[in-house]
Amino acid sequence: MLLHIIARGRIGRGPEAELVERYMKRVTWAQKISELPDTGGRVPAAAAGSRTILLDEGGEQMSSLEFANLLENWRDGGVREARFCIGAADGFTPDERKGADKVIAFGRATWPHLMARAMLAEQLWRATSIIAGHPYHREGRQ
């Protein structure tokens, strides 16, 4: 399953970019990152067999194990692409939220989009390592 990060804003070079690169290098699943301008630009069209997750402070809070189980179930169910969308400062429109398969949050706090991207990269590494049985995540699997 392709893990596709679609993010508003350019990450450039900096500590957040280094974290994203470090964690995404560890992920063995197919992956893609699409950067869009802060305003305008078109989100790439979703292909058949894809799922879209929006990262939003008002979304569902999932544990790392729940996130891993979601990805594993989608992969095993034939989902070809999981799209993770990180919005700009104003978040997502009601239509975008309505069209998403899932809206999740990394806690109740508001995070800058560059930090959210780094946190997503770490959670993708953690989830795929849990699925692979790698000892990175110390909590037992459900």
Swiss-Prot record:
Catalytic activity: pseudouridine(1915) in 23S rRNA + S-adenosyl-L-methionine = N(3)-methylpseudouridine(1915) in 23S rRNA + S-adenosyl-L-homocysteine + H(+)
Primary residence: cytoplasm
Subcellular location: Cytoplasm
GO-annotated cellular components: cytoplasm
Top-level taxonomic group: Bacteria
Transmembrane residue ranges: none
Binding site for S-adenosyl-L-methionine: 55, 87
This enzyme's EC code(s): 2.1.1.177
A molecular function GO annotation: rRNA (pseudouridine-N3-)-methyltransferase activity
CDD domains: RlmH-like
Function: Specifically methylates the pseudouridine at position 1915 (m3Psi1915) in 23S rRNA.
Record-linked PANTHER family: METHYLTRANSFERASE, RIBOSOMAL RNA LARGE SUBUNIT METHYLTRANSFERASE H
Subunit note: Homodimer.
The protein's name in its UniProt record: Ribosomal RNA large subunit methyltransferase H
Gene label: rlmH
